[in-house]
A protein has these predicted regions:
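Bacterial N-terminal signal peptides
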Residues: 8-18
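Divalent metal-coordination and catalytic microenvironments
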Residues: 36, 52, 62, 77, ...
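Sec/Tat signal peptide C-region and signal peptidase I cleavage site
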Residues: 19-23
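Accessory terminal helices/loops
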Residues: 24, 226-228, 239-304
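Active-site metal-binding motif and surrounding structural segment of the metallo-beta-lactamase
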Residues: 30, 55-57, 67-112, 156
Length: 304
């Protein structure tokens, strides 16, 4: 894809603007990975958003945890560049990653894995008053929701696809059975930056729904580690390195070992849920999700 002269000129001007404002405050939640690659880190382990500048426009990874985040992300983008947001790539279809789509699309074209649209529409049908409840959270949230409309992906891919935008290449990869019905990892091979979806989260228990299996999670982590990324942005939690994956692998390995030991002692699943302790992870948030983790580990043990 060749850039048009007008876009090249706009890109040069935009880069000069970036250099002049990078010393300014983009907000405490904006962190810089590399030149032109930023992350909006969600508050209190909320979902993250990636901001990638190219010569032909901006690509976002998810749209923020809620519309107040989306508005803050848009404000940061406008400080960084005058170029439009061309694409928004979903790492998953859940509302805490997608409600803010309306802030960016149009003009942004939303891309997700096959099945994301159906998942999003199902949740809208199941929770018809969701937006009304969200607006009641605070006056700021109500203001951020002004103009809300449901925005589903305009493009769905299957298994793998590549998006070339300006000087950057984005490789989209489906992650089977790790979190939702349609999880996507986004890999920038030249920059060695990976947006790893919610296959692994930081300092909190992940919810393991019936569609999720620990072997699928471990397979996805192994694949992503094999890319040898320099920077990793998880779906939730502080961005970092492959240590995020290693910590997650260690946790699931320990969980399976302990569940297996208790199962061999003759304990039922309900007994294991009541008695199992993981003191190494007492500092992790979302402890209400532990039962779903134990159930997933129990399935692994019983399948051996």
């Amino acid at each position: 894809m060749k850039a048009k002269p007008a876009l090249v000129l706009a890109a040069i001007i935009s880069l000069l603007l970036v250099r002049s404002i990078e010393a300014q405050d983009l907000g405490p939640q904006i962190k810089k990975f590399k030149d032109g690659i930023y992350v909006y880190v969600g508050k209190e382990l909320n979902s993250n958003c990636g901001i990638v500048l190219t010569q032909e426009g901006v690509i976002l990874i998810d749209s923020g945890h809620n519309p107040t985040d989306s508005r803050a992300i848009l404000a940061a983008v406008k400080k960084l560049t005058s170029l439009p947001i061309r694409f928004l790539i979903d790492t998953e279809p859940h509302p805490d990653h997608t409600t803010g789509h309306f802030v960016f699309s149009p003009p942004a074209v939303v891309i997700a894995h096959e099945g994301a649209t159906e998942s999003m529409k199902n949740r809208e049908r199941e929770s018809p008053d969701r937006i009304q409840k969200l607006a009641a959270v605070s006056p700021e949230m109500r203001a951020a929701l002004e103009g809300y409309r449901f925005v589903a992906p305009q493009i769905e891919y299957r298994q793998k696809t590549t998006l070339n935008m300006g000087e950057r290449t984005f490789e989209l990869m489906y992650l089977k059975g790790v979190h939702s019905e349609a999880d996507t990892a986004i890999w920038l091979p030249k920059e060695r930056v990976l947006f790893s979806a919610s296959a692994a989260v930081v300092n909190q228990y992940n919810i393991l729904r019936p569609i999720v299996t620990i072997p699928d999670i471990l397979a996805a982590l192994k694949m992503m580690k094999g890319l040898n990324p320099e920077f990793v942005m998880p779906g939730h939690g502080t961005p970092g390195t492959v240590k995020i994956f290693e910590d997650t692998e260690r946790y699931y390995g320990l969980l399976i070992d302990r569940v297996g030991k208790m199962e061999r002692e003759g304990k039922s699943l309900d007994e294991i849920k009541k008695e199992l302790r993981m003191p190494e992870y007492d500092s992790w948030a979302s402890k209400d999700r532990i039962p779903s983790n134990i159930e997933a580990a129990y399935k692994v043990v019983k399948s051996k």
